[in-house]
Amino acid sequence: MSLPKLADHPTATAGNPQDVAIQSLDPSSNETSSMEPSHSEKVHIESDVEESMEARIERLGRERPPIFKSLWAELGFIFSVLMSQILTEYFVSGFNLILPTLIEDLDIPQASSVWPATAFSLVIAATLLVFGRLGDMYGGYPVYLLGLAWLVGLGPAAFLPTGVMLIGTVYRPGPRKNLVFALYGTFAVIGFYFGIFCAGLVGQYIRWGWYFWIGAFLAFITLITSAIFVPNDYKERRKNAITMDWPGAGATVCGIVLVVFAITESAHTPQGWRTPYIPTLFCVGCILLLIAVYIEGWVAEMPLLPGDIFTTPCMTQLTVALLLLYGNCGIYLLYGTLYFQNIMGATPLQVVAWFTPVAVGGIVLNILQAYLLHLVPGHFLLIVAGAGAVGSPLLLALVPAGGSYWAWVFPSCVLTTMSIDLSYTVICVFLTTQLPSARQGLAGGLINSVMQLGMALALGLSDIIQSYTVDEAGLRKSYQNTFWFAVATGSACSILMVIWGRKVGKAASDLTADEKLELEREAARLSSSSRAETGGN
C-alpha cells in the first residue's frame, strides 16, 4: 500500500495519526482553493475522506499482493509455505506412532524411549530464534530453502519462522491474510493426520524406513516449488543492516538444551536428581540462560529477542499461554498414542482412525476462522481454545478401564483440535500484525520457538511423572497421571487467555505496523513544525 502524501497542515496533531492522513486529503488544505469551506462542509468532506480511506484499506486487505503477477504465482507461494506445516507435523505426529516399532527394531531401552520424540522439539525450540534472526538478516527466501534442503531437526527450525515471516511480510492486515494463516493452520492439521496415516501404514505393513523416505520426497517437492514461487527478498533484507548476536545465541541454545536434557534424563538415571551430572547440567544450563538474558538485555546491540517486543499489549501473557498450550498438546499426542496402543490395544491403523476427528475438526475450524476472524473478537476464540485445552486431557485422565472410544476418546479429540487450531491462527495473526516487517522473522521465531519449547519441557516433566509412578500405580495409571499434568497446564493457559486475551480483538483490515509508525512520525513532525511556527510568530 502506498500511503497518501502527507501535506503540511497546521491543524494536524500527533495525538491521532489517522487524522494526519485524512487532513492531507482535505481539499481545504489546497493553496489554490479560492474559497474556504464552511464548518459544515469541512465535517462532510472529512467524513467522506475518512470513509474512502477505510474503504481503501478494506479493499487492499482483500486484494492479491502486488508482488504476485498472477493468481498462479500466489497459489504457488501459498502451497510452498503451507508445505512447511505439513512437513513439520508429519514428523511430529507420525514419529509418535511409529516410535513403538522403532524402539523394538532398534532395541532402544525403555529409559531412552522418550528421547526420539523429545529431541525433535528440543532442537527446533533451541535454534528457532537463531534462524528467525537469519531470516531477518538475509531474507526469508534463502533461509527457507536452506531448511528444506537440510537436516530433519534443524530444517524445521529454519523454515518454520521464515514461513510465518514470509506470510506476515507479503500480506497486509485483512481478510486475505486471515485466510492464508487459516490455511496455514489447516495444513498443520492435514500434516498431522497425513503423518500418522503414513506411519500407521508403514508400521503395520512395510519397514519403518519408508516413513522417512516419504518425508524426504515431500521436502524435495517443496524445495522445487519454493525456489520457483517464493519471492527472493535477500537484497531488501540486507538493506536493514541487521546483525546476529552470536554470544547471546550460543548461550541461549546451550542453556535450553542442557536444562531440557537434565529434566528429561532425570527420570531414567539410577538415582534421579541425586545422580551427579543431572543437577550439574541443570545448573550450568540455568547459568547459561541467565548469561543470555544479561547479554540480550544489556550487552547486545541487536538482541535476538528485544525486550521492547513485550511492550506490546498482553504479549508476555500470550507467550506464556502459548507455551502452556503446546505443552498440553505434546502430552496429549505422545501419551495419548501410547495409551491407545498399550492400554486400549489399538493397532497403528486404528490409532489413525481414532485421530480422524482431529483432522476433520481442524480443517473445519480453520476454514471457519478464515471468514470469522475479522468479525469475531479473538478473545472469544482464545477462551474456547482454553476450554478445549482443559477438557481434552481431562477425559483421558478419567477414562475407566475398558472405556469406549466414542464415550471418551472421540470427544477428547474434538476438544484438542479446538484448543490448538483456534489459538494458533489467532495468535499468529495478532503477533505478525503488531510487529513491523523488519521483525517478521522474530515473530515467526518467537511463535514457533515457544510452541516447540512448550512441547519439549512438558514431555520432559511428564516423563518424570510417568516414570516415578509406573512401579506403584501401574502403566495405565502412570499414563493418566501425565494427563492430569496436562489438565493443570491447560487450566493455567485458560486463566491467562481469559484475563489477558481481552486485548486481542477482531482481525479486520488495517494499516500495517510500518504504515502506522510512518504516520506517527509524520504527525510528530507536523506537530513540531506547528509549534515552531507559533513560537516564531
Where are these regions (language model features)?
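Cytosolic juxtamembrane N-terminal segment immediately preceding the first transmembrane helix
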Residues: 2-90, 104, 527-534
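Transmembrane core module of solute transporters
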Residues: 79-83, 90, 95-100, 107, ...
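Interfacial helix-cap and linker-helix signal at transmembrane-aqueous boundaries
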Residues: 102-103, 134-135, 198-206, 263, ...
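Loop-to-transmembrane helix entry/capping segments in MFS-fold secondary transporters
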Residues: 110-111, 174-184, 348-349, 435-447
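Central cavity-lining transmembrane alpha-helices of secondary-active solute carriers
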Residues: 118-133, 160-164, 356-369
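Hydrophobic transmembrane-helix bundles of small-molecule transporters
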Residues: 206-320
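A late C-terminal transmembrane helix in Major Facilitator Superfamily
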Residues: 434-471
